[in-house]
């Protein structure tokens, strides 16, 4: 059997933005289908705005890449993502794709939704909320301090999503003696060693 030829697409682009220190900003996102392979490289030119006093600290710019499957973002109890795509065994599956109604929300420049493709000032009726769910899942798993911060709420239901946060998050500082200091000695209850009777 002869293999089908795979097509190649050049998706290169320029992303110009300004950001505050510590913000977790999505700079790109792709929807990947089964058997898709994506090869990417990133180059960055970083400039600082004029400051009243120079920064006396090391500044690291980190660009991380993640793959988040839809099955982690959309867990349906009575149906599956496959049923949504195929229509189920009878072809009549009516599962609604997760969305957020943005008609009552105003998007501003520099918001998470701005970085995820919703232009500032635009108010589309429905927005594919899976991108914001993926962002929040990545923040929960990789960037939050589990001792000091509460997890972001992520809905995994179909239809209208009213609980998934759509605000830009900040990352935690690198681990050192100061940032890992806690007001308690250990997690959980204290150990009481059995002493002789």
Where in the sequence are the language-model features?
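Intrinsically disordered, low-complexity segments
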Residues: 1-197
